Amino acid sequence: MVKSELVQIIARHNPHLFQRDVENIVNAIFEEISTALANGDRVELRGFGAFSVKSRSARNGRNPRTGEAVAVDEKWIPFFKTGKDLRDRLNQ
């Protein structure tokens, strides 16, 4: 599912909302989650899961085309941990 499909489904289930309004709401939610993660905060959606950022240490990598060793800098990556309710639903 892509974002536009999500917007269409939510709009279909909520006929009192215009699709443009639903799209604005979905975009606002994603923007707030992104901003919180960029600030190093954790975003928890009870029962669904939690978004956070984790540090990936600097390491030596290898260029797959040439085989040359390449230094890869430390970086922050987004991480999602599923909530218990979501895990239970997936494993029914």
From Swiss-Prot:
GO terms for biological process: DNA recombination; regulation of DNA-templated transcription; regulation of translation. Belongs to the bacterial histone-like protein family. The keyword Transcription regulation applies. It comes from the Bacteria. Heterodimer of an alpha and a beta chain. GO terms for cellular component: chromosome; cytosol. The keyword DNA-binding applies. GO terms for molecular function: DNA binding; structural constituent of chromatin. It comes from Bartonella tribocorum (strain CIP 105476 / IBS 506). Keywords: DNA recombination, DNA-binding, Transcription, Transcription regulation, Translation regulation. This protein is one of the two subunits of integration host factor, a specific DNA-binding protein that functions in genetic recombination as well as in transcriptional and translational control. Pfam families: Bac_DNA_binding. SMART domains: BHL. InterPro entries: Hist_DNA-bd (IPR000119), Histone-like_DNA-bd_CS (IPR020816), IHF-like_DNA-bd_dom_sf (IPR010992), IHF_beta (IPR005685). This is Integration host factor subunit beta.
